[in-house]
A protein has these predicted regions:
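Basic, Lys/Arg-enriched alpha-helical interface segments
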Residues: 1-67, 76-80, 87-122
Length: 122
């Protein structure tokens, strides 16, 4: 069964600003996530420690000597929500992950909150 992979609306705008070859690379990894879902593990996916969401993960890949990390989490509807990403190469690791996780947590909270009105309508 294929899994749904969606972009948080803020990440979608950031994705559109990326170079097209980098977009293609990210989409190729998103397809792996779509196929394997939560069973996709290292080295492609790893848990993000320090997030307030126990299911917060990072999609990991290299592109043109850059080390990319994309934070995502599975929501209650079983969709992988891509939240934020960036090149962690050449920057302080603690600072990179602190910013990545803070943004991912905030965006995932927003996403979960947006699902609640839908649940009330049922």
């Amino acid at each position: 069964m294929p899994w749904s992979v969606i972009f948080h609306e803020d990440f979608d705008a950031e994705f559109q600003a990326l170079d097209e070859p980098l977009q293609d690379e990210l989409l190729a990894h998103a397809k792996l996530l779509q196929f394997y879902g939560p069973d996709l593990g290292r080295p492609t996916v790893d848990t993000l420690k320090g997030s307030k969401h126990a299911n917060m993960k990072e999609l990991r890949f290299s592109w043109q000597r850059q080390v990319w990390r994309m934070a995502f989490a599975f929501d209650p509807k079983r969709s992988a929500v891509l939240l934020v990403g960036g090149d962690k190469g050449g920057v302080d690791q603690k600072r990179f992950y602190k910013r990545l996780i803070a943004t991912a947590d905030r965006r995932f909270d927003e996403h979960i909150a947006s699902l609640k009105p839908l649940a009330k309508k049922r």
